[in-house]
Amino acid sequence: MAIEPLSITRPTPPPTPHPDSPAGPAPALLCLPYAGGAAGAYHGLRGACGAVEVVAVQLPGRENRIAEPPEFSVPRLTDEIASHTARPYALYGHSMGARIAFEVARELRRRGLPPPLRLYAGAAHPPDRRVPLAATADLPDEAFIDQLVRRAGAPEELRDVPELRELLLPVLRADFTWIKRYRYAPEPPLDVPVVAFAGLGDAEVPPGDMLGWARHTRAGFALRTLRGGHLFVRDGSAELARLITADLAGPGPGRGTDPPPVQDDEIHVRVFPADEPPGTPGSDEGGSSRAADRAGGSSQAVDRAGGLAVEATVRGGAVGAAVGLPAAYGAARDAAHGASPGAGRGDGPGDGLGPGEWEQLVDAAEEDRPWLELRARTARRALARAGAHAQAAEGFPDLAAPGPWPADDGWQVTFLPLHTPLGEALAAVAEPRGRTRLSADVWTDR
């Protein structure tokens, strides 16, 4: 399997390394394309990554390998990528490419070869989750193309330009067949930090879905949300390059001592052990928004439950945070046996269930009740700790809605499903509506 290194210049010096980052030469960034994509998709990163050498993997059936059948295999890709492992390197895969990069990293581990410094996953469902678009692989051409244009950012010209359709359709069919046939095989999590990049306007793989990548590492996880849609790597490469080069120069996801600077439209969430020593971010007691003015005018909220802590940081304004595990509450279990809610039920200020929420619990399938209750209670606690007015007495109208949930007085609640060494958990962050870009650092050490 051939690999086509991109010819790059080095007009800027290497980024200043963090004291905890690996010493030595600047790393290579090995990039795997999205379905239907090719090495050329990464030309935008070439001039934006400074001293980081961008190496784009060319899959068969595209660009300079157009004459080859468009099928590939992970073992053959790993054979060629292995030649780059003698120097520091990182893997980046976008959409389908992220799933390929994940499997390449696992195959390198099986072979006892040096692991990447990072696994970067862009706009991709976690490998243990189904890809909804995979169902389009068997559709007739017109319907297949329509789905890709509407949902995956494929060019409109695919509908109307016969030459482009003739060129790309065999590659797209082959790639989506690979996605459809892919089966995740459980193995221990990677000892490689994982950084997931989501597109703010990507309805196919929203940022919350990408938090599931935390299940697949025990070396730290981060999520960053970029402006753009599903193919932000094509249209927003400068921002992506800035985040990657800064990360490679730093200590790794979740290893810093301060939250990253947040912008006006951004909220940063950090998840860490509740017994983290004093003096580190989020180590103060309490759960109020504290509106503590930090550097740059940012405010912070902290909450603890079940051995976990969550810290939310915004720039300006107020913010509230809450975290919990499903086993922490008993109303869902009571509902299974026909109990009534009673007055003032709830384990903390502001998190009692409303009558409408209780009715939803009673009507829900028994296995869904703990999570639905957790969503209602954490949402209410986050709002209360932000200083927002409590939700209307009836409660939230749809506990199964993905969020953000609109709340009273112009507030909203965003949920983060968490995958931590203590098990599955849920964080809720309350903020004024309009602050939409999520970034997160999640503790995953086992």
Name every feature range the model reports, one short phrase each.
Residues 94, 233, 371-375:
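Aromatic-acidic/polar surface patches that form glycan- and anion
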Residues 1-92, 99-255:
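Domain-scale detector for complete catalytic domains at protein termini or as standalone homologs
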Residues 95-97, 114, 191, 305-307, ...:
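Short connector loops at helix/strand junctions that flank enzyme active sites
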Residues 252-329, 333-446:
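Core catalytic alpha/beta fold that binds nucleotide/phospho-ligands
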Residues 93-100, 326, 334:
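Catalytic nucleophile loop
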